Amino acid sequence: MTTAARPTFEPARGGRGKGEGDLSQLSKQYSSRDLPSHTKIKYRQATQDAPEEVRSRDFRRELEERERVVARDKNRDRPTREHTSSVSKKPRLDQIPAANLDADDPLTDEDGDEDSDEDSDDDTAALLAELEKIKKERAEEKDRKELEQKAEEERIRMENILSGNPLLNLTGPAAQSQASFKVKRRWDDDVVFKNCAKGVDEMKKQKRFVNDTLRSEFHKKFMEKYIK
């Protein structure tokens, strides 16, 4: 049996290689598995939430500081937006000369916004009414289907009851009625060992023995039952 597949747990000993005449000297060839590994201990770093760091931190103060920074950034962006919106509105107001202003002029942007808001409210109300109508129709359709299903199940149940009772199933054809009234054979009519004691008295009365297989009573009964 070969030993080539067995692992080597120690380096080979020298003495047989080229220039290795001293048998007591170990070989310089060694396996990487024999080298020491994990020679340094890994310490917990400063950002790995050591128990001492967690106990010394003030989480509430850090949370408040982060909230203040976020609020400061929001307040810093808000004036810029207001300034840009006011600058964009000024040219449109300046473009309208004062002499052309009249009471019969079309509605301003604010009035148009109000009208659009009213239109959107009307559209929303119409959509909600349509949605409610659709929901009501679906509920009615579901109730109707459930009633139809219950009626069909009741009809099938009554049909099964009437067809299962031969005394009530007189409305069908004559052949079906005759078949339903026919007496069924028992499951053990043609079994092998049925009525084993039948005919014992007759056999006792005869008390005869024939040393012939073809003229024996068993052979006669067998031929009469299966051949004739």
Swiss-Prot record:
Name the InterPro entries for this protein: Cwf_Cwc_15 (IPR006973)
One GO MF annotation is:
RNA binding
Instruction: Give positions of region: Disordered.
Output: 1-126
Positions with biased composition (Basic and acidic residues) = 52-84
* Composition-biased stretches (Polar residues): 24-34
Q: Name one GO biological process term.
A: mRNA cis splicing, via spliceosome
Record's Gene Ontology CC terms?
catalytic step 2 spliceosome; nucleus; U2-type catalytic step 2 spliceosome
Tell me which positions the record assigns to the signal sequence: none
Per UniProt, subcellular location reads as: Nucleus
| Coiled-coil regions listed in the entry | 121-165
Q: What is its main location?
A: nucleus
Family, similarity comment: Belongs to the CWC15 family.
Q: Please explain the role this protein plays, according to its UniProt record.
A: Involved in pre-mRNA splicing as component of the spliceosome.
What is the protein name stated in its UniProt record?
A: Protein CWC15 homolog A
The organism's taxonomy opens as: Eukaryota, Metazoa, Chordata, Craniata, Vertebrata
Name of the gene encoding the protein in the UniProt record:
cwc15-a
